[in-house]
């Protein structure tokens, strides 16, 4: 029987949200224009007013990536993860994550953040990743937040044909959107 250790990312393992610094970095490197930043801000504003979905806001924020070559996207995404996100991990959070891995638990980042840069974070930490996928056409798939985190976790467990001891499993989060995942686990 497997036990899991599940970690939200933004606000739990790092301070704040990761997509805004990602967009700022893309702009600073010349990959995203000021117009792209304005489109992202507009998308976020419309989302907050409940006039757009989270998926639409993420798609709009990341639309500049469609103009980049695959190599340029990989360089931007990997560089952001290595040079910005990983150095900003809360030391106690990283220590906790690594301790769970050393204890033999299956460890996963479960995040609404997009996979284009989160995959580099997960790979560097040696953990699995369940997050919002960016489709080949640049659109964001279903936002991995709230009850969607639980749905994705159950699919992840079924895909691996694991039997999970949910009462002995751990979940870490910092917001209301993490509550369904937190309620799933005993710790």
Residue ranges and their predicted role:
Residues 1-2, 75, 82-187:
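C-terminal cap/substrate-recognition subdomain and adjoining C-terminal extension
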Residues 1-49:
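Active-site neighborhood of HAD-like aspartate-dependent phosphohydrolases
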Residues 3, 31-32, 43, 49-52, ...:
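Conserved alpha/beta cores of soluble small-molecule-handling proteins
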Residues 13-16, 51, 67, 147-150:
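Electropositive phosphate-/nucleotide-binding environments in soluble metabolic enzymes
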Residues 19, 57-58, 135-137:
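Acidic/polar active-site rim loop that often engages polyanionic ligands
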Residues 21-22, 41, 60, 76, ...:
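A general alpha-helix detector
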Residues 48, 64, 68, 134:
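Active-site phosphate/ATP/adenylate-binding loop shared across adenylate-forming ligases
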Residues 56-92:
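Metal-dependent phosphoesterase signature
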